[in-house]
Each structure stands twice: as C-alpha cells, then as structure tokens.
Amino acid sequence: MEELLEILNDIKDELNGNVKLVFQPAEEGIGGALPMIEDGILENPHVDAAFALHVEPLEKTGNIQIKDGSIMASPDDFKIVVHGVGGHASAPEKCVNPVTIGTAIITEFEKLNATVLKDKPCVMTVCYFNGGTCNNAIPQTAEIMGTARSLDNETREMLIELLDKTAHETAKKHG
C-alpha cells in the first residue's frame, strides 16, 4: 500500500478528482466496511467509485483477480449448544446423548450444502464440534461452531434462517 501511495503522489497532478485509501479493520468481526460507511467514510469528499483489495493466499504471487460486484463473502459465525441428558455410558437408555444429536445436525448441514445451497452464493462450514471429556460418560452438552458466508443480504437471511430451522428440527427429532 505504501508503494501505491508513492505512485499516486507522483501522479497527483494528472488525476482528476480525489483519491481515498481506506483500510478496513476487523472485517470478519465487529468491524468491517458497514460501520465505516455509517460513520461517513464515503463523504467529504464524496466517493464516486471504489476499488477493493483483499489478499488471496491461494492465488499465485504476482497474479490478480478482477470481478465486478461482490467477490468476498460476509461471515456469520454460529455456535450451537446441544443440550442432552448426561449419564454413564453403561446406561445410554437413561440419557439423551447430545453428541449423537450434534452429529445428526452436522450431517443435515452437509446435506444442505450438497442440495439446497449448492447453487447459491454462499457456503456453510462446521469447523468445531466438542462433546464430553471422557470415554465412559455421556455429556450434558455438545457444541458445534462454524461460519456461514454469503455474498448478499437476501442469501444471508435465508442461510441463517435455514441453519436455525435445521438445527432445531433435527434436535427435536432426536429427543
């Protein structure tokens, strides 16, 4: 970015208009572009055109990709806590195993990826699953965490609703 600043400074007399270089902090957390836009980053002076840059570690060094419209998806992290009835592994009939329910939820999510979501501008990935701390006790809870990413608000809302509905319906089926 420093090199770009130097180049732009060298040709500033040839430029028609103003140039703003904006750095987007914490784009995958509470930061990102929206709070900056709401705070007026695109005004004073007004921005007529914007170009974005995002590092792509899988792209060969020296190559760039150019695309009109959205190219990087917005992330929505999710965490699901499955509540069961814990107990000793010798008496599973007295328990509701949250690990079993959690694996069923993850399986249903993968089915969504392969069917409903396969042609949509989104992706949903389970990245964490944890239930229990030993090999002879059924735990009280299990946790599932992941990320749902989408390129537009309509798809984002559909994806969040679908994940919530699928998790609740699957849990209900299993006790």
Provide a role label for each language-model segment:
Residues E2-L4, L8, D13-P139:
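Histidine/acidic-residue-rich, glycine-tolerant segments that coordinate divalent metal ions
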Residues D164-H174:
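A common structural junction motif
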Residues Q140, H174-G175:
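Flexible hinge/switch segments at interdomain interfaces of large molecular machines
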Residues N135-E161:
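A conserved active-site cap/scaffold subdomain adjacent to cofactor or substrate pockets
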Residues N97-T100, M158, L162:
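A general alpha-helical scaffold signature found inside nucleotide-binding enzyme cores
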Residues C127-N130, L159-D164:
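A general structural motif
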